[in-house]
A protein has these predicted regions:
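N-terminal leader segment of winged-helix/HTH proteins
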Residues: 1-36, 83, 152-157
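C-terminal regulatory/oligomerization modules of transcriptional regulators
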Residues: 1-9, 128-157
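Short alpha-helical elements of helix-turn-helix
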Residues: 12-16, 36-47, 69, 132
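Short, locally clustered residues in the helix-turn-helix/winged-helix DNA-binding domain
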Residues: 19-22, 47-51, 112, 139
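Charged, amphipathic alpha-helical coiled-coil/dimerization segments
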Residues: 54, 76-143
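Helix-turn-helix DNA-binding elements, focusing on the entry/boundary residues of the two helices
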Residues: 57
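The alpha-helix within a helix-turn-helix
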Residues: 61
């Protein structure tokens, strides 16, 4: 027995379609990462460190959108897995600088594969050109609505 279809008008509201696609995407990525004993915040921090280099906890929070209070737990988990190193900042020994370790780079390589697999599953109904166009359009929407100083979202692990 197939579910009752949504009313046609609901299937034409972009915000509703985006929300539905976001739920599916979040579930797919979350399940794939959980199978690797990881979550999307681990991935975000590892990517940020790999691309931008060592950073303070506050800078990582700004760049990833993860609240500072939540960042502590994420960094503790990554440190426990030897994926990051915390060292006192040369200019201010009260502050820590977080950097990626070789184990963190290997972990990121594995998570990159996991994320890519989830993206392939999510976007399977689309051609390569449609996938590229979707990414371009979503980027435009996101950039257009980005506040001047984005506030990190709470609890979106």
């Amino acid at each position: 027995v197939s579910p009752t279809p949504e009313p046609a008008r609901l299937r034409t509201i972009p915000s509703r379609l985006l929300a539905g696609a976001a739920l599916v995407a979040d579930r797919l990525v979350g399940e794939r990462l959980a199978a690797e004993d990881a979550h999307k915040w681990h991935f975000a921090v590892l990517v940020t460190l790999a691309e931008a280099g060592a950073a303070s906890q506050a800078e990582l929070s700004r760049r990833t959108g993860i609240y500072r209070s939540d960042m502590v737990a994420v960094l503790n988990e990554l440190a426990d897995a030897a994926c990051i190193r915390r060292e006192p900042a040369p200019a201010d020994r009260r502050r820590n600088v977080i950097s990626l370790t070789p184990a963190g780079r290997r972990r990121l390589e594995r998570l990159d594969t996991v994320i890519a697999d989830a993206q392939r599953e999510l976007l399977a109904p689309l051609t390569t050109g449609e996938q590229d166009e979707l990414v371009r359009l979503l980027g435009l929407l996101t950039e257009h609505h980005r506040p001047p100083h984005p506030r990190p979202q709470r609890g979106a692990r």
